[in-house]
A protein has these predicted regions:
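Histidine-acidic metal/acid-base catalytic patches
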Residues: 2, 22-63, 185-206, 210-300
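Catalytic-core regions built around general acid/base machinery
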Residues: 81-90, 157-165, 221, 250-254
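Active-site acidic/histidine proton-transfer and metal-coordination neighborhood
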Residues: 87, 94, 105-203, 278
Length: 300
């Protein structure tokens, strides 16, 4: 653990020096903290490494983060919301979004009654409101939903969660992987969800990598369902912009059509030649900061 802390501190110093000398254009840019799970994924690692990691991210140019460590009882990364907000404030960051999972069980689906799930969400929303979070996002769906009737129940569930979020000044969203672009009973799973959720209460956090991996065009979805994608995941599996497979220029050039207000970088793994997740984060940040098609801000 001591070696990890020393290594992080050394890397953070390098990023701090580079940011002072290069002074890239400031852009509103988020990062999913799941990307750094090897450094801060557990509560213990977060407590040990948070100061150095959060400062390093801010020095790279990130302005906000998305969480992925809610315990279901009001704590994020093992901390009370007030403490986590203080940690982020000290680094010059804010938390705009969080990924939390609370699936329905077989009884909920059979009865189409999910009222027993809503107190959990009320606790979740209250905790994240203390952090100033804008978006609460369900990161995935069960992979074994057999019928559109089950998907419809989830859509109604999401509408209900979205109403709770809206009452507290937040937005509820759903994050896709590739499986949502498959068909159930002849209907594309993802399309059905968009068409059967209320745009007042539910947005869709398009993960552009997973969409591309499924063989669909994010931009075509922006055109088909304008305004439904308020926050998107900017991902290239490894460092953003390095594979040449994902058309980030077209994605960002159509951000207004999509309804994008915020975007969040996510890195699934580090390239072998890079070898360090913080360096992967820096390469991704530099790509977006220097890209002429990425605006300084998408918020109104």
């Amino acid at each position: 653990m001591k070696k990890i802390i020393i290594a992080i501190a050394s890397i953070a110093f390098v990023f701090s020096f580079a940011s002072c000398s290069q002074k890239p254009a400031k852009k509103e840019m988020g990062i999913q903290l799941y990307s750094l799970r090897t450094l801060i994924g557990s509560d213990e690692d977060f407590a040990a490494n948070k100061t150095e990691v959060l400062k390093a991210l801010a020095d790279m140019g990130y302005t906000c983060v998305e969480a992925a460590n809610y315990d279901g009882e009001g704590h994020i990364y093992g901390e009370e919301p007030e403490q986590l907000k203080a940690d982020l404030d000290a680094a010059g960051l804010k938390m705009i979004s969080t990924h939390v999972n609370h699936w329905l069980d077989d009884e909920n689906l059979a009865s189409k009654d999910f009222s027993n799930r809503m107190d959990w969400w009320k606790t979740c929303i209250a905790a994240h409101k203390k952090l100033g979070v804008k978006y609460i996002v369900m990161p995935s769906m069960p992979g074994d939903l057999p019928t559109l009737a089950d998907v419809k129940t989830y859509c109604e569930y999401y509408n209900a969660i979205g109403k709770l979020c809206a009452d507290q000044g937040m937005k509820f969203g759903f994050h896709n992987h590739s499986g949502e672009f498959e068909k159930i009973e002849g209907k594309v799973f993802y399309d059905y969800m968009i068409e059967n959720t209320d745009p007042r209460y539910v947005f869709f956090q398009m993960d552009v990598y997973w969409a591309d991996n499924a063989g669909v065009s994010p931009v075509e979805y922006f055109k088909r369902y304008p305004g439904r994608f308020e926050c998107i995941h900017v991902k290239d599996w490894r460092e953003v912009g390095q594979s040449g497979k994902v058309g980030f220029d077209a994605i960002f050039n159509n951000a207004a059509l999509a309804g994008v207000k915020d975007y969040v970088v996510e890195i699934e793994e580090t390239s072998p030649e890079v070898g360090d997740i913080l360096e992967s984060c820096r390469i991704s940040a530099d790509y977006l900061l220097s890209a002429p098609f990425v605006k300084e801000s998408y918020s109104e």
